[in-house]
Structure formats: C-alpha cells, structure tokens
Amino acid sequence: MGDPKYPRRVWRKPKRPLNYELKMEELKTLGTFGLRTKRELWKAHTELSRVRHQARSLLALRQEVRAEKEPILMKSLARIGLVSSDATLDDVLNLTANDLLSRRLQTIVTKKLGFKTPYQARQAVIHGHIMIGERKVDIPSYTVTVEEENSIHFAPESKIPQVLEKTKSEAPAEETVEAPAEETVEAPAEEKKEESPSTES
C-alpha cells in the first residue's frame, strides 16, 4: 500500500506575532485584499519565502547548471503574472506578499468586474457566480494565470451584474443646494424717551 502521506503545513506564523507594527500592517493587508483570516496572509508569505529560496539557490549554482534550471522557475512565475517574460532572478528576490495576493481570483474579480469591495467579490466567488472560461471556480485564493485573466466573467444565471448596474443607477447624485437668502428685517424704531423728566417737588 505504500507509506501514508502526511500533509505538510503550508503556512508559518511570524516570529513575533504580537508586534504592534506587524499587527497593524497585517490588518491593513487583510482589509486591502479582503482576506478572511491572517492564515491566508501567512500562506502568501510562506509561498513567497519558498520562491525566493529557489532564486537564491539558483544564484549559488554554477553558470551551466543555473542556465538549465533558471528558465523553469522564471517560466512558472511569468505564467501566473508575477514577473515579466524578460525578468531576472533579482526581480524574483524583489517580490512581495502583495504581489502574490494581487494574483488571487478574489482580487482580480474585484478590479475586473466592478465590485466595490473585495469582500463582495469574495461572496460572489464562494457562491458560484464567477466563471473562468467554461468552468465555475469557487475558491477565492485560486491563483489566476495570465491566459485565464481575460476569460473571467459572471455565470450566465448570475443576477449580480443587474444588481451592480441597479446600484450604480440608484446612487444619489450630488446636488448643489443654494443657501436661502437671508431676510433683512429692519429693527423697530426706539421708543421716544420722555420729553422732560419729572419735576422735583
């Protein structure tokens, strides 16, 4: 039967998870990309660490071995839109976790299909409203390739496009209301003072 497979953890926690600056940066990233938990962010950091480790390992190889293995890594990264076709290993080392998160299906759907927030796009993906080509994809963290990016669209039975158009048309236009003119009211004339004071007896 063979040895059983033990799944390896695909994410690692930061060394100082309670650091204030790190926590604020993580919360900002969670809001920007609509992540549900920090675990999704840690997965991106772990994957980035793996890719950068491969790049550093290639830099340490002999030139002939590096020339054989480097195109394999660069082609795989260019396929998912992380680097350009003429990028170098230095470009790989300059990648950030935000670069990986920007290739998620949730992020691309937010920008491409006109959602206001990434959380709206996440709900649409999870409930099967998004298709890539002829197949539905309900995984928000799915990594979209460059070839697939132009084939992302709503499912034919989805009513979300009509809802988005309706919300756009019902958005109240900003009207400039002129302030009412102030009415000038003349002050009443002062009562005439007594012509002569009372005479002393």
Curated annotation (Swiss-Prot):
Residues 103-167 form the S4 RNA-binding domain. Residues 172-185 have a biased composition (Acidic residues). Residues 189-201 have a biased composition (Basic and acidic residues). GO terms for biological process: ribosomal small subunit biogenesis; translation. One of its GO terms (molecular function) is rRNA binding. Keywords: Ribonucleoprotein, Ribosomal protein, RNA-binding, rRNA-binding. Residues 163-201 are annotated as: Disordered. One of its GO terms (cellular component) is small ribosomal subunit. InterPro entries: Ribosomal_uS4, Ribosomal_uS4_arc, Ribosomal_uS4_euk/arc, Ribosomal_uS4_N, S4_RNA-bd, S4_RNA-bd_sf. Part of the 30S ribosomal subunit. Contacts protein S5. The interaction surface between S4 and S5 is involved in control of translational fidelity. One of the primary rRNA binding proteins, it binds directly to 16S rRNA where it nucleates assembly of the body of the 30S subunit. Belongs to the universal ribosomal protein uS4 family. This is Small ribosomal subunit protein uS4. The gene is rps4.
